[in-house]
Structures are given as C-alpha cells and as structure tokens.
Amino acid sequence: MAKKKKKVDENNQVLATNRKARHDYQILDTWEAGVVLLGTEIKSLREGKASLVDAFAVIDNGEVWLHNLHIPTYSMGSWTNHSPKRTRKLLLHRREIDSLMGKVRDGNRTLVPLKLYLVNGRVKLELGLAQGKQDYDKRQDIKRRTEEREVTRELGRRIKGINA
C-alpha cells in the first residue's frame, strides 16, 4: 500500500521572514500582532508573495501602523485590487501599545517586522523591538557563527573517526 502524503496545513504557515532584520538589528523583545488586510491581500499572501525587507512600524495617535510591507497585487484580481505598499494597521492590546511607546521613546530603538505568518487562517506579524547594530557588532556576530560552525564540524569529524 502506498504511503499517504502529509497534508500541508494552509492555516498555519510562514508567509515571509525578514532575515536582514536579525543581521542589521539587535532584537530586544518581540510581540505578536494581527494585521488589518483586504481580501485581495490575503489571497496574494496565500500565493506566497510578500516582502518584509524595508518594512517598519510606527506608533501614531496610539495606533501601530506598518509601512513598506510589499504585498503584490493579486494575479486574479480586477479593479478591486489593493495598492502593494499601502500602510496597514497592526492590532495590539492597549497596554502592549503603551509599553511599546515607552520603549521606543527611550531612544535609538525602532519597531521591525520579523515574520509574517498564518495562525488558524488569520495573518499575524511578529514585531520586534530593535536596536541598530554597528559594523563591528555585525563582524563579531559573523566571526562567532563561523567559529561555532568550525567547532561543530570538527566534533563531527572526530566522532566519525572514532565510530568508523
């Protein structure tokens, strides 16, 4: 009897990640926020087309807004299609917004989207409180990662040498 293929859960999947944010910023804390979207935006996201590269969040009048999230127009859409880089509202609890306002106002910090994903059919955004890294910090991180990689590689070689 043939094996059954595992069904991909379309209601719980990662739609886009912002890998550059973890490289350019030190992430101090994260929050999960809902995103207010139009119907054609949801359909376009389900096609796997989104970019968080230049996106950032701003707190304005006690509301959190996401700028520069690029969701291309829906391929099967008509005149009802959305604008690809429109400003989108993020849904957070009032005390979370107040906490964010205090932390961003302290200075030298910004709100950066890290991941866009589906939870039970609803689009959620992982929002990070970020502080910019200097060039030497980035170089130190790269050096540390390469050293860790070399150590694990050497351990693997030694284990294979003993067991083989």
From Swiss-Prot:
Its main location: cytoplasm. GO terms for cellular component: cytosol. Disulfide bonds: none annotated. It holds the Pfam family SmpB. One of its GO terms (biological process) is trans-translation. Gene3D superfamilies: 2.40.280.10. One of its GO terms (molecular function) is RNA binding. InterPro entries: SmpB, SsrA-bd_prot, SsrA-bd_prot_CS. HAMAP family: SmpB. This is SsrA-binding protein. It comes from Corynebacterium efficiens (strain DSM 44549 / YS-314 / AJ 12310 / JCM 11189 / NBRC 100395). The gene is smpB.
